[in-house]
């Protein structure tokens, strides 16, 4: 038996009567009120979602040309006039016929691929052919094939998922009954029936539910990740008509499809009557029906037009800073390539001029055919000018791998490997929410190692967002006795028909206040206390859900809602005897100290960030109409009746004290409405609710007009505890050189208190507070702060605290530069009373004025713009849904995971990727320069001693795998060393792992090594009878050995995979050379066997290795000995074990690490 059903309720009715019959009162113990002229009025959700950055068409204005008509239960008529999409979804990108052209088109968006395609095409021309036509295409074809296979596999999985989704079954009203129909065949305008625990196949407007009041409960986990149940309502006018679907006539005029899952704006016309529809009347695809037997609705959006599919766009695309910097070096390499080609062409021109009379017989340019073969033809010679032209482009073809085509695919593979290890890091797994780290943007892993500015939300990011009611101020009197003894209070419960109901969560109570509520309304003080807790129980959107316990006679009331603050306040009201036990579309039921009372909900203005408050108008059991309002003090005190000035003053004093303790505060007010006020509000509310143009603005205006002259009832104080490990994490990040900005909507006192508890602020910091109400005042405060910091030279101990009002003048005027100058000199920045759009503005302010990397982290929808504005966005999968996660590049469960993410994985990723890019430049340039040196000894022609297949396989097989393995597995320092010494993170901030200087050092080393590889065999075999193919094999093997040993010299942590990759590549290169030389049709037939059996071959190989790498080894040794880097010092300390014996420079991070996952 459901205790909610045991509460006596009148049968449902919705008469349209005169204004005179406003009330009726029933039994003494179960008081109820019905409003004859209004019926059992459903809850209206007005003034919702007014955040400017979150507004879409559904919450702004809708014009007739932007509307669409849906005829209820008439899909033929609906789809005849409008070409609506079907309900079939398609997340797959390709089909069998479009895969090849579309995939190639997408891949060739990379300019490098176009470059190699042009090279391959040039090689097909007879005048420019250097390599075999097949061999020249192979590198590009290999890269394209690998990417195509990966894309095809991913798309196959999408196709399979689409088929499963589209073939699910739903009940659709057809031919006078509900029939099963595949989801993909559902059309707009059809009426569908969804049963309990089923998932909705489309977006539908509710017509009726199994609950006679029209309420339905849905879970939106699949849509936004929130597990709390939400209520949606069918219109009272459609409940009775839905019983006879055959005669149901009407249409819906709604906005066109949009992505805003929190907004919907439409009108319904039935029997000539116009009804307004809002977000509370629509259920979206992906939602799951809960605690409701069935629901009927009409399809308004289907398939790709549903809000769920429109939001299925994934994380935003960003490019890493390292890859952007890499493009500069690629341009430099391109210029270097042009220089080499120009040198080859110019020297060839000089040589041709000098030897123009010998071209008939001289080697490489012989024009005459002296063979005695029949039909012999002279060699083609195109003349001096054309030969120079062709030489240049032939050089481009020969030296093409100077631009490393394999680098792109290598970077992708390395990032996938890095993401795998980040995702499976047990120390970034949150047991409380059972959530692992998510890497949603693979292409910016290395940016995690270069963060300089961190912008963090507070609520839900630094704190748990699990609110606990702490104390209250009623009529200016503080009730904050929070002695531990109070925790032994058994908690409030009621008995209904032998069933005990009690709140699911217990709240510590103030004994004085508890005793006051027990006295009823015996005194004025007790009356105000009762009004206060009645306000908390009634002024909200919480849904009470009754759940079973192990004791069949005891049931728990669980309060589900979208706001943790509201949940805490309703639980507090229940603890003091005001137990909310039922909410429907038109009324709420509250048990007040054993007496069940029913309140008709006449109207509800939900919270929005413009008003910063919410209000509800109730028809009370005493036949009065009362307005209850709660909101932020900044918005509430301005609408209070000034005659209560003394109470307001005392309340402000208590609010300041609460905020100084780090508590979140709200102010509660109320007033009774007379008949004329109510009727005036009701007519305005009805007009605004049914408006299709500017509805949100009209509702805000209606709310603002009624929310005036309030009597202050009291204020609440809620504690939002810091997440575990936040203080240690912030201190480590600051030691790492990361400037932490905390952006919060809380009061300044609350924000400062949290700043101290989180170690963002310290007691020895000098605080610069800027609270300005004008542009001139703001400018003067900033200039004084700038001068003060510059004169005292104490930037390391200065904290800047600025409020949202001041930021309005800063962000909208020319003060951004001044604020940036001040902030750069401060070690901590705290912004309070900040609106969501200001968060993004602050990030943009810093991002546009520095080349340093920025990271933003948050957990709610109000953090989305900030997350997307920053170079790196991190979402917390917390209590406020998944909007932040869906907009982020990385997602995790707790703020403290930023420490291992940045200081460990970020450092590793940056170091590895920077080294890998430089190494790829080096290994390709070595090979190209060997080919270039050879040109100088072949009359400046573009012939090569190295076989074309070795040229192709060099960057694909011979040297590619080791660099990928090192990029994924190598670690320059251990995890604990990086955590214990956050200063080591500065390596990335200072770009020590990759820079233009390092690039030029690498190129100088490349020139030396290529010269050693080429000239040692050249001079060793000078004057001998060795053929060019044998010499080419020696150069190939020497190059592979040298570049792999070069890599081996830089490996820090060896394992069997690293050994297999490096030494295996050398062995694989030798095997490939042997296989190529045993093919009779190739020019180097048996060459390796001829040269490999001589002692000179092995001597040259040894001499090349020593000569190439000895200078590098010596310089590296001297630099590390005389000018060691921080990383080198830390590495040596690791080897010697001195870190374990000494005190860490940073803070001990063991306290903020999760235990390994089981």
Curated annotation (Swiss-Prot):
Region (Disordered) location: 1-30
Miscellaneous comment text of the record: Knockdown mutants are cold sensitive.
EC number assigned by the record: 7.6.2.1
UniProt name for this protein: Phospholipid-transporting ATPase 1
Reported tissue expression: Expressed in roots, flowers, anthers, leaves, vascular tissues and stems.
Catalyses which reaction(s): ATP + H2O + phospholipidSide 1 = ADP + phosphate + phospholipidSide 2
Cellular compartments annotated: Endoplasmic reticulum membrane; Cell membrane
Chain ranges on the Extracellular side, renumbered to this chain: 123-127, 352-391, 935-948, 1021-1027, 1078-1090
Pfam family, one: Cation_ATPase
Keyword line: ATP-binding, Cell membrane, Endoplasmic reticulum, Magnesium, Membrane, Metal-binding, Nucleotide-binding, Translocase, Transmembrane, Transmembrane helix
Membrane protein topology class: Multi-pass membrane protein
Family: Belongs to the cation transport ATPase (P-type) (TC 3.A.3) family. Type IV subfamily.
Positions annotated to bind Mg(2+): 859, 863
């Amino acid at each position: 038996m459901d205790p909610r059903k045991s509460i006596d309720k009148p049968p449902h009715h919705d008469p349209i009567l005169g204004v005179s019959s406003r009330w009726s009162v029933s039994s003494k113990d179960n008081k109820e009120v019905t409003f004859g002229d209004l019926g059992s009025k459903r809850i209206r959700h007005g003034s919702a979602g007014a955040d400017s950055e979150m507004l879409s068409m559904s919450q702004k204005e809708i014009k007739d040309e932007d509307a669409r008509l849906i005829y209820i239960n008439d899909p033929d008529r609906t789809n005849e006039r409008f070409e609506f999409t079907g309900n079939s979804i398609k997340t797959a990108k390709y089909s069998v016929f479009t895969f090849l052209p579309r995939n190639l088109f997408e891949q060739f968006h990379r300019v490098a691929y176009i470059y190699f395609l042009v090279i391959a095409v040039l090689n097909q021309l007879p005048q420019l052919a250097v390599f075999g036509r097949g061999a020249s295409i192979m590198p590009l074809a290999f890269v394209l094939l690998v990417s195509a296979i990966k894309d095809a596999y991913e798309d196959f999985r999408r196709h399979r998922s689409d088929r499963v989704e589209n073939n699910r079954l739903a009940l659709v009203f057809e031919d006078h009954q509900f029939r099963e129909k595949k989801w993909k065949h559902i059309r707009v305008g059809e009426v569908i029936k969804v049963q309990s625990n089923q998932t909705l196949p489309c977006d539908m407007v509710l017509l009726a539910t199994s609950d006679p009041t029209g309420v339905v409960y849905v879970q939106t986990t699949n849509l936004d990740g929130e597990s709390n149940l939400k209520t949606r309502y069918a219109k009272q006018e459609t409940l009775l008509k839905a019983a006879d679907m055959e005669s149901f006539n009407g249409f819906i005029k709604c906005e066109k499809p949009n992505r805003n899952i929190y907004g919907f704006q439409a009108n319904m016309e039935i029997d000539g009557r116009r009804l307004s529809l809002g977000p509370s009347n629509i259920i979206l695809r992906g939602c799951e029906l809960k605690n409701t037997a069935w629901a009927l609705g009409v399809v308004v959006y289907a398939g790709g037009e549903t809000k769920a599919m429109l939001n299925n766009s994934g994380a935003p695309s960003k490019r890493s800073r390292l890859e952007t910097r890499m493009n500069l070096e690629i341009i430099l390499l391109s210029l270097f390539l042009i220089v080499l080609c120009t040198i080859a062409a110019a020297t060839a021109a000089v040589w041709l001029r000098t030897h123009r009379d010998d071209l008939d017989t001289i080697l490489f340019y012989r024009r005459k055919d002296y063979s005695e073969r029949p039909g012999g033809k002279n060699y083609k010679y195109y003349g001096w000018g054309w030969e120079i032209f062709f030489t240049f482009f032939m050089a481009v073809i020969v030296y093409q791998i100077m631009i490393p085509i394999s680098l792109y695919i290598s970077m992708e593979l390395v990032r996938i490997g890095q993401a795998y290890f980040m995702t499976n890091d047990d120390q970034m797994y949150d047991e409380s929410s059972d959530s692992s780290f998510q890497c949603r943007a693979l292409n910016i892993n290395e940016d995690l190692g270069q963060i300089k500015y961190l912008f963090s939300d507070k609520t839900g990011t630094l704190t748990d967002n699990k609110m606990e009611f702490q104390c209250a101020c009623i009529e200016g009197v503080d009730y904050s006795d929070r002695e531990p003894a109070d925790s032994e209070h058994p908690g409030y419960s009621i008995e209904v028909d032998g069933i005990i109901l009690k709140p699911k969560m217990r709240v510590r109570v103030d004994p004085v206040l508890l005793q006051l509520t027990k006295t009823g309304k015996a005194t004025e003080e007790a009356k105000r206390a009762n009004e206060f807790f009645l306000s908390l129980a009634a002024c909200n959107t919480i849904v009470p859900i009754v759940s079973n316990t192990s004791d069949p006679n005891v049931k728990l009331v669980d309060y589900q809602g979208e706001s943790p603050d509201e949940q805490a306040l309703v639980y507090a009201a229940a603890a003091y005897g005001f137990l909310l036990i039922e909410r429907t579309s038109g009324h709420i039921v509250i048990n007040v100290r054993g007496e069940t009372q029913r309140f008709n909900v006449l109207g509800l203005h939900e919270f929005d960030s413009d008003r910063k408050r919410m209000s509800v108008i109730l028809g009370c059991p005493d036949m009065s109409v009362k307005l209850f309002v709660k909101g932020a003090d900044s918005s509430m005190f301005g609408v209070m009746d000034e005659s209560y000035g003394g109470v307001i003053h005392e309340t402000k004093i208590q609010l300041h004290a609460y905020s100084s303790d780090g508590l979140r505060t709200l102010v509660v007010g109320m007033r009774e409405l007379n008949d004329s006020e109510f009727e005036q509000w009701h007519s305005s509310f009805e007009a605004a609710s049914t408006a299709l143009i500017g509805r949100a603005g009209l509702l805000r205006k209606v709310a603002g007009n009624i929310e005036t002259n309030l009597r202050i009832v009291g204020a609440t104080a809620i504690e939002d505890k810091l997440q575990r490990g936040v203080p240690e994490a912030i201190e480590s990040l600051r030691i790492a050189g990361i400037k932490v900005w905390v952006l919060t909507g809380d009061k300044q006192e609350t924000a400062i208190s949290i700043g101290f508890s989180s170690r963002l602020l310290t007691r020895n910091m000098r605080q610069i507070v800027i609270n300005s109400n004008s542009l001139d005042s703001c400018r003067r405060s900033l200039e004084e702060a700038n001068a003060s910091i510059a004169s005292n030279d104490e930037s390391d101990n200065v904290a800047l605290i600025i409020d949202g009002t001041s930021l309005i003048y800063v962000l909208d005027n020319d003060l951004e530069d001044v604020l940036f100058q001040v902030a750069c000199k401060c070690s901590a920045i705290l912004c309070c009373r900040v609106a969501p759009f200001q968060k993004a503005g602050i990030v943009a302010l810093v991002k546009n004025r520095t080349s340093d990397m920025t990271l933003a982290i948050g957990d709610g929808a109000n953090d989305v713009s900030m997350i997307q504005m920053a170079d790196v966005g991190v979402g917390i999968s917390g209590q406020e849904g998944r909007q932040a996660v869906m907009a982020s590049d990385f997602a995790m469960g707790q703020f403290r995971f930023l420490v291992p993410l940045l200081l460990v994985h970020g450092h590793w990723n940056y170091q590895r990727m920077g080294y890998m890019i430089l190494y790829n430049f080096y290994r390709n340039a070595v090979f190209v320069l060997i080919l270039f040196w050879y040109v100088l000894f072949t009359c400046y022609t573009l012939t090569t001693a190295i076989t074309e297949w070795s040229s192709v396989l060099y960057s694909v097989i011979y040297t590619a795998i080791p660099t990928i393995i090192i990029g994924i597995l190598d670690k320059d320092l251990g995890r604990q060393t990086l955590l214990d010494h956050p200063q080591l993170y500065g390596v990335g901030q200072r770009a020590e792992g990759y820079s233009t200087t390092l690039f030029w050092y690498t190129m100088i080393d490349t020139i030396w090594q290529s010269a050693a590889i080429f000239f040692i065999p050249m001079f060793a075999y000078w004057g001998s009878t060795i053929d060019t193919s044998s010499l080419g094999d020696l150069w190939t093997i020497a190059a592979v050995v040298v570049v792999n040993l070069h890599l081996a010299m830089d490996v820090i942590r060896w394992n069997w995979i690293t050994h297999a990759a490096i030494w295996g590549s050398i062995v694989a290169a030798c095997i490939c050379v042997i296989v190529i030389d045993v093919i009779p049709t190739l020019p180097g037939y048996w060459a390796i066997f001829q040269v490999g059996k001589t002692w000179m071959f092995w001597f040259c190989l040894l001499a090349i290795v020593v000569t190439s790498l000895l200078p590098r080894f010596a310089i590296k040794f001297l630099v590390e000995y005389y000018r060691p880097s921080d990383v080198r010092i830390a590495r040596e300390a690791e080897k010697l074990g001195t870190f374990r014996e000494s005190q860490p420079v940073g803070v001990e991070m063991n306290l903020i690490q999760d235990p390994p996952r089981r």
